[in-house]
């Protein structure tokens, strides 16, 4: 009977440690690094740069609910501007941009254009 209790306690302890470890590993693959005026600045891991769902979640977290919002995304923190206007290099390094206007209901996520994208396509150039 005592061995069963020890086994149950050990199993619970192991399950708790594993749950805590998996939570620590499941860190978001983006970070809100600041703002310039009303523009929110977010860095994403390169592998997440084209993940629309993740980018929308990051934008929702960075924006104030019910307010107009622009979120600019980079995959390299070294390219995030510290002032406006941003340089051409910083602008080219942007991987996505999210825009929300709650008055009109407009909401748009533009991803970086793939090379060879048609000129009229809706993407971040």
What are these regions (language model features)?
Residues 2, 32, 71, 96-101:
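Generic preference for hydrophobic/aromatic residues in regular secondary structure cores
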Residues 26-43:
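Short N-terminal segments immediately surrounding and downstream of signal-peptide cleavage
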């Amino acid at each position: 009977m005592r061995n069963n209790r020890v086994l149950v306690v050990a199993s619970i302890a192991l399950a708790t440690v594993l749950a805590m470890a998996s939570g620590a590993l499941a860190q978001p693959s983006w970070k809100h690094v600041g703002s310039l005026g009303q523009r929110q600045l977010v860095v994403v891991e390169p592998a997440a740069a084209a993940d629309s769902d993740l980018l929308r979640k990051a934008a929702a977290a960075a924006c104030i609910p019910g307010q107009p919002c622009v979120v600019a995304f980079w995959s390299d923190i070294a390219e995030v501007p510290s002032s406006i206007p941003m340089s051409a290099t910083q602008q080219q390094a942007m991987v996505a941009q999210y825009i929300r206007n709650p008055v009109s209901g407009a909401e748009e996520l533009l991803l970086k254009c793939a090379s060879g994208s048609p000129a009229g396509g809706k993407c971040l150039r």
